[in-house]
């Protein structure tokens, strides 16, 4: 259904991947995995036509509809929730809206009637059963939007709920080919379960990027691994890929070690007997073997393990945080109502709940970024807290280097300490001098962890 031919993508001298020739079949759901910056999102954008390849081409079977999950939560602020979903089929959306305008015309001329007939044909082609409104209503209700809210503007929704609408937008038309870049971001647990069920029943072709191993195991039939500037396909789930790739790496190590040992033995024989007349013929034979021997090398993977170390600067007491009678409302809508809890030394707490219920609001209040309507936030006297915000990729921006960005976070820190924190998150040497605004989303998340460690 989708095929790449000699695909290559490079940014200047830096090659992300090259010589990519893969075929994505109907009925298969591919998980696209790889290290931060390896080129996953770039490859997905090339597949979906959002970005050009440096070389090669992408071929999509004629007549197949492609759906791509939008990453811009603010693109439909002036649309109703219902219309934002309907825009998943833009041809149908435009025809319906034009029909509505024409029906408001003061006069039904022949020209108007002819155009209405043309629009009716388009609607019939795109929605033969005339059930688009039923389908959209059902999918929105499944995602937690009651029917009464479907005419609300997108601008009234939280970030998490906007993302749910974008999911509905790409899933509602049932495209033959589905491209999803991190679809579980900002979703609550219940919605992730719903999405898993929807994707398991997708009978076309799907490519999804996710860092959620459990999600990949639940929805994928195949794995596409971006590494070594190549994209390799594996059958099975993420766990199947992990087992197979580990075995391949071990086998490669064994093969290289075996050839290296053979090379050393040949070199020793040649050095020992090349000057010996009786052994000269054998030495010459060994030299020919050595010349033909290709030891090769262990391929350098783009995957590297970070070293995340959170060190306390001083000892803390028993009570770290006390929250007393905290309440918060937005436009009359109560989000937090008289919240009370205590965090003690050693606690590890998960904050869960549906989208829009107030989890991020509570975190922002604790951090001091949002003011509560009432109540108290009492931090322990020796506490120094850190915060990883939901919008980390938006917070980390600017035309400055990674080093300068982290330096601005703590002007009192030693130069070596700053470079150490960057190095632990795999930003070494010249990488520390690259611009923040050139970083991928995953790299910005690593930057935020560097800040927290600092």
Task: Give residue spans per PLM region.
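ABC ATP-binding cassette signature C-motif
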Residues: 1-256, 305, 309-454
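Intracellular alpha-helical coupling/juxtamembrane segments of multi-pass membrane proteins
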Residues: 244-297
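Short Gly/Ser/Thr- and Asp/Glu-enriched loop/turn motifs at secondary-structure junctions
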Residues: 285, 303-305
